[in-house]
């Protein structure tokens, strides 16, 4: 009876604390529902200006839209491949040396906390403006996400086949590729497709920081208030995302066995995927690092290893704690 009363008290205290945090956040951010209600008509007016879209502008949208899709596919593929092998080091049941696992997990978690837009901004400083920087940013972001997902999936697997192969003298990496990857791959590929769907949407805004794709065109037309062309860009982007998600749903159903599989279908799908990937690599064909880019990397690493702790504990509006 006492334990039940104690739980009720804890739940009430937790509810009150959460309400206090929510109210505090509203107060600090200056959230005002009246502003949203009073200016809601502006949002409706903005949408009305976009429709009907300027269909004559369709031809100008195709090239940057294709570039956006290329960035997404190439970045997701590269990130997923590297993430698969990083998952081997991330998983606690495969790597017995705790310091290796801890270092890998810290790096992965640190990268995961950085939004892909910030990664793209940093990439433009290093590799210059264009789709190459966007592709690299998506690849790094995907690598971190898939390394964690893959590592956690590995921890949920039974490792008896892996242990049996290592027991007969095979190396850990060989045993991993012959046993764990085979069992892990269907679920890993399905998760990669989910990440690809998200990356298509991420890639659409990377142009705002000069990382190529349709975002650059979208930013330009919004700035010039050419709303009918903005509408055309959004319609074509919606269609592209819809097509990619349709293909993704089909491939996930194929991997899950909901669609009948055979050798011919496996070969055709594998060839199509490789063709799309090779074609998408044209998005990074001009990647190069200048001397300035190397200096930027050095400056970034110096900033990471020598943080300004005073900025961390500043109480003003420019301090990290307030932001």
Predicted regions and their residues:
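Cytoplasmic-entry segments and transmembrane alpha-helices of multi-pass inner-membrane transporters
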Residues: 85-120, 149
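N-terminal, non-cleaved signal-anchor transmembrane helix
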Residues: 1-73, 77, 246-323
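Loop-to-transmembrane-helix entry motif
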Residues: 54, 68-76, 107, 111-117, ...
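Generic hydrophobic transmembrane alpha-helix motif, especially the helices
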Residues: 108-142
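Membrane-cytosol interface at the C-terminal ends of specific transmembrane alpha-helices
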Residues: 129-195, 202, 246-249
């Amino acid at each position: 009876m006492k334990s039940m009363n104690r739980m009720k008290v804890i739940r009430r205290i937790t509810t009150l604390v959460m309400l206090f945090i929510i109210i505090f956040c509203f107060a600090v951010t200056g959230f005002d529902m009246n502003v949203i209600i009073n200016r809601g008509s502006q949002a409706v007016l903005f949408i009305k200006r976009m429709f009907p879209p300027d269909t004559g502008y369709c031809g100008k949208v195709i090239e940057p839209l294709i570039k956006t899709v290329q960035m997404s596919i190439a970045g997701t593929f590269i990130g997923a491949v590297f993430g698969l092998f990083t998952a081997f080091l991330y998983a606690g049941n495969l790597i017995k040396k705790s310091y290796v696992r801890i270092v890998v997990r810290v790096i992965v978690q640190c990268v995961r906390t950085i939004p892909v837009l910030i990664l793209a901004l940093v990439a433009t400083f290093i590799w210059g403006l264009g789709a190459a920087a966007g592709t690299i940013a998506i690849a790094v972001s995907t690598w971190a996400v898939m390394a964690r997902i893959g590592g956690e999936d590995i921890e949920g697997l039974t490792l008896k086949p892996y242990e049996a192969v290592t027991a007969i003298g095979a190396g850990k990496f060989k045993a991993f590729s012959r046993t764990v990857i085979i069992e892990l791959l269907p679920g890993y590929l399905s998760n990669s497709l989910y990440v690809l769907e998200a990356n298509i949407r991420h890639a659409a805004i990377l142009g705002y920081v000069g990382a190529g794709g349709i975002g650059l065109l979208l930013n330009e037309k919004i700035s010039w208030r050419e709303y009918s062309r903005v509408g055309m860009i959004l319609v074509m982007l919606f269609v592209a995302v819809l097509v990619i998600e349709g293909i993704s749903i089909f491939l996930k159903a194929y991997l899950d066995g909901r669609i009948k599989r055979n050798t011919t279908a496996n070969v055709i799908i594998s060839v199509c995927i490789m063709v799309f990937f090779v074609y998408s690599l044209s998005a990074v064909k001009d990647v190069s690092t200048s001397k300035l880019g190397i200096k930027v990397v050095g400056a970034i690493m110096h900033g990471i290893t020598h943080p300004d702790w005073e900025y961390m504990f500043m109480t003003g509006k420019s301090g990290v704690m307030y932001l």
